[in-house]
């Protein structure tokens, strides 16, 4: 009779992915989550952003360990990942503020605030801009999202949407002009 046994499974890999990864992540979370949260706050993240960044760091650590990546010092890896997430958050905030500035800062009477992310008036302004972006035609909306949320250059936007870089620039220009017109018209009411 032919041997019809189950496929051979690397017991070490199975243990590593099922319990080793889990133990490593749990141990790190239990011992360092408060310090990681504090570090994220010192990077300038608000409480809810800091909490999300710590959770994202733990998730990324779990994924890396589960994929078999050897991480010599999970503690240092986690803090480095958290630092990068904090930097990414600041970059996103600058891009979003850049969009508001691009279509004409000072909407709703808020002027010369720079990129103060904690300013409630600025946050309302950014939300108003993205709400207006949502009402643009599909192609313009996609280009503005990829440019200002994903920070892609026009060459990559063109590749992503199957258009030329100059067409992407054109859609961005038209979309920005439409946003300026709509938002300033609402402001005049």
What are these regions (language model features)?
Residues 3, 14-38, 48-51, 62, ...:
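A short, charge-rich alpha-helical start-of-domain segment used by transcription regulators
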Residues 11-16, 25, 128-136:
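Short amphipathic alpha-helical boundary/capping segments
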Residues 28, 32, 36, 40, ...:
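Residue-level preference for hydrophobic side chains embedded in well-ordered alpha helices
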Residues 33, 37, 58, 137, ...:
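C-terminal flanking helix
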Residues 52-59, 63, 72-84:
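Structural recognition of an alpha-helix C-terminal capping motif at a helix-to-coil junction
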Residues 66, 80-109, 114, 122:
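Arg/Lys-rich amphipathic alpha helix in sigma70-family domain 2
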Residues 83, 87, 155, 161-187:
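DNA-recognition helix of helix-turn-helix
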Residues 143-147:
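A short pre-motif secondary-structure segment
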């Amino acid at each position: 009779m032919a041997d019809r046994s189950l496929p051979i499974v690397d017991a070490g890999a199975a243990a590593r992915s099922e319990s080793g990864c889990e133990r490593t992540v749990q141990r790190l979370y239990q011992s360092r989550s408060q310090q990681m949260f504090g570090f994220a706050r010192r990077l300038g993240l608000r409480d809810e952003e800091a909490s999300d960044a710590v959770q994202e760091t733990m998730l990324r650590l779990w994924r890396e360990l589960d994929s078999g990546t050897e991480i010599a010092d999970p503690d240092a890896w986690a803090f480095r990942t958290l630092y990068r997430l904090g930097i990414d958050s600041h970059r996103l905030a600058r891009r979003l503020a850049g969009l508001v500035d691009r279509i004409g800062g000072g909407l709703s009477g808020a002027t010369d605030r720079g990129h103060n992310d904690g300013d409630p008036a600025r946050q309302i302004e950014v939300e108003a801009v993205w709400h207006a972006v949502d009402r643009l035609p599909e192609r313009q909306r996609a280009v503005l999202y990829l440019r200002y949320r994903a920070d892609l250059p026009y060459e990559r936007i063109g590749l992503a949407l199957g258009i030329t870089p100059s067409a992407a620039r054109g859609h961005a220009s038209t979309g920005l002009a439409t946003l300026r017109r709509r938002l300033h018209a609402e402001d005049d009411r």
